[in-house]
């Protein structure tokens, strides 16, 4: 299953990392080790964010993915399952059937048929 790893890096730790001349090499090693499909870096709420798209086959892979970010970056780490458009197209018909099975008459009147 495809997951988004979002690592929020505290300012102090981030400042130290970017001053390390080996930082980019270490980051690239992590990306290669976890076989990230994609890696993106951005700012959010004043923090440095690193995000990676990875394939997780089983839950026991999570520590391998997260611990280097906790230990080496002091990051706040979140893991979120994500879908491609093809995944969404595949799952949506059954999701609509399931959602409609829980729908009440009041909800149908308020929201109409979708």
Residue ranges and their predicted role:
Residues 1-114:
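Conserved, structured core segments of small domains
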């Amino acid at each position: 299953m495809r997951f988004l790893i979002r690592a929020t890096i505290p300012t102090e730790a981030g400042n130290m990392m970017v001053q390390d001349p080996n930082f980019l090499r270490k980051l690239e090693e992590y990306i290669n080790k976890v076989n990230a499909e994609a890696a993106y870096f951005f700012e959010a709420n004043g923090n440095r964010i690193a995000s990676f798209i990875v394939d997780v086959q089983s839950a026991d892979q999570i520590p391998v993915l997260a611990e280097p970010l906790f230990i080496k970056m002091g990051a706040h780490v979140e893991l979120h399952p994500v879908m491609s458009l093809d995944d969404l197209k595949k799952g949506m018909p059954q999701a609509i059937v399931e959602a409609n099975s829980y729908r009440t008459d009041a909800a149908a009147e308020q929201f109409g048929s979708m």
